Each structure stands twice: as C-alpha cells, then as structure tokens.
Regions:
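Glycine-rich, N-terminal phosphate-binding loop of Rossmann-like dinucleotide-binding domains
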Residues: 197
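Conserved SAM/SAH cofactor-binding pocket of Class I
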Residues: 92, 96-175, 189
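Short loop/turn elements that flank and shape the SAM/SAH-binding pocket of Class I
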Residues: 75-76, 176-181
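N-terminal auxiliary segments of SAM/dcSAM-dependent transferases
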Residues: 1-79
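A short, conserved alpha-helix within the catalytic core of class I
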Residues: 200-207
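A short acidic, Gly/Pro-enriched loop at the edge of an enzyme's catalytic core
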Residues: 180-192
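Proteins enriched for Cys/Gly/acidic motifs involved in redox and nucleic-acid/cofactor modification
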Residues: 60-86, 90-100, 106
Length: 207
C-alpha cells in the first residue's frame, strides 16, 4: 500500500454503521462493542431518511468533454450545448458519477469507445459506465455485478436513456467463481472492457 496513503490514515477515526432498530439489531450492536472501550452514540433513522436524503445533494454534472450526468428527478433541465446526457437513478448501488474513479472511467470512454462495437462492464453498479458507453456510440453492452440489486437498477437506468434489453444485458454473479457466467461472457469478444472495481478482482481477471 502507498506509504503516503498509510500516513494519511493515521490519527482519530470515526466509524459509522447501521443496524435494524429491533432486538436483533441491538444484539448485533452489543456484540460489536464487546471489548471496545470507546465513546459511541446511537440515533434512529426514519424509514426514508437514509434511502432518499442523499438525493438533494446529487446534482447534474459535466464530465470530460462530452458527457452530462443527470439525476432522473432533474431530467427536465436542458443539456449544455454539445453535451450528451446520461440519466440516472442509482438507488442504493454504486455509480452516481461523483466518485473520482467513476469520472476517470467516464472520461476514458470518450477516447476509447469503439462506435458500433460492444462493451463489457464488470462491476456495473448503477450501469453508469456501460450506459454512457452506449450513449457515446457503443452498439451494445453486457454488464455484471456481484450485487443482485444492481440488475434491476441498471436495467431501469438503461430505460431512462431509451436503451432496451435488445442492446443491454445485465447479470448478477461473481466472475471469479461462477463458471457458467464466465462461459456466457466468453462467448463474445469486446473491444472495450470496463472495470471500475478493486485491484484484487482485476488482477486475477487479467492473468
């Protein structure tokens, strides 16, 4: 690990986690706190607080030279001149466009997407990368995520951008262990593979 990063990680840390507000959640909290002699506070969240409160901070953003990432609830705004809109409702999956690694991937798409050719998106989350790739000219995309929730979210986001299932296939599974999934993905060649995921997954795939 990078020494500068390790140095920045030193000091006081605050850890937040969430449990259900019932007997099981309280028992889980008690187990986690065993042997920890540190101050802590608890607070109850309303059913919709955690699921929707973030939306007020998620605003349209320009990325690179061509893309305009737009939350679904702000799609009535007019795209800036020369920008290709990508409409999203990421829900609880990764992929809003705010994260630096996502933005770097989006900027890379502008340079590396092959018009009329398919892309493979590993760790698709909300589908932002593969959907943006098709908005920039890719013919189709196959997307995979280990989180089953990502399948519906990615399909819904594709629909927001006028992309149907004839062009977009989303699967849930682990590409390192699911041999049936690996076989399915291996049935086609992709000029561009998108993988905004941790190195521990990318390295075995590239071997």
């Amino acid at each position: 690990m990078d020494e500068d990063l390790m140095e920045r990680m030193k000091g006081v840390c605050r850890v937040k986690f969430y449990v259900t507000d019932d007997a099981d959640g309280k028992a889980q909290l008690a187990r986690w706190l065993e042997g920890i002699d540190k101050p802590y506070t608890t607070a109850s969240l309303g059913d919709n607080d955690w699921a929707h409160s973030w939306q007020k901070y998620y605003k349209p953003m320009t990325v690179g030279e061509k893309l305009w990432i737009v939350p679904e609830w702000e799609r009535d705004q007019t795209p800036p001149e020369g920008r290709t809109p990508v409409y999203l409702n990421p829900g609880l999956t990764f992929g809003t466009g705010n994260h630096a690694s996502t933005q770097l991937c989006l900027m890379g798409l502008e340079e590396y997407v092959v018009p009329g050719a398919p892309v493979l998106d590993l760790g698709c989350g909300s589908g932002i990368l593969s959907i943006a790739a098709m908005a920039l000219g890719a013919s189709s995309a196959v997307a995979v995520d280990i989180d089953p929730k990502a399948v519906d979210v990615a399909y819904e986001n594709a629909g927001l951008n006028g992309i149907g299932r004839d062009r977009y296939t989303v699967r849930a599974g682990d590409v390192l262990t699911d041999q049936a999934l690996v076989k399915e993905l291996g049935g086609q060649r992709y000029p561009l593979v998108l993988a905004n995921i941790v190195a521990d997954v990318i390295m075995p795939l590239s071997a």
